[in-house]
Amino acid sequence: MADVAEARRRDTTLMGMYLFLASEIMLFGGLFAVALALRLLHPQDVVAASRRLHYGVGAANTVVLLTSSLAVALAVAAAEMGKAKGTVAGLLAAAGLGVGFLALKAVEYGMEIRERLLPAFTPADAFESPAAHLFLDLYLIATALHAVHVTVGVGLLAGLAWRVRRSGLPLPRGATGVEVVGLYWHLVDVIWVFLYPVLYLVR
């Protein structure tokens, strides 16, 4: 009976998480749609603006997040096997990589501010065209919103690692909690995998 109740609780928890993730996909989906519309309406201006972005830094951050996804997957697998040390190691590795992503993004923003690429810190007349201004506005909004999600994810990963280490989340019974946070982190990574080509590789 207890196993049935636990299975139902897990299914309910995962369903709630899937609904939340769907809402996040719709949020970023709207930004992707705007980017596509801009690309179709103003191809030359958008391509010119995209070429000024630091695609090398973006590529490095893509590798960082993909590696963090692997770490989370290993943490979930360890949690399901009841291995607390492996779970903590995977969660902390992913959190550390998340911090690395944010640090690289901060450096990139600093470069872009100095190069007068970010509309929030640059007069409107410094841009080649209104379309370029709008595209770089979209870039800042999308990447900053994503960075907020990464920050939340890092907090969740670190907090969960602390709970597991302190035995506040017994394993494997508490593996669902690790799985839920893992799903969130994977979504954050997938969103970036789409953001990178949409924003940096427009040609």
Where are these regions (language model features)?
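...captures the hydrophobic TM-helix bundle architecture rather than a specific catalytic motif
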Residues: 1-203
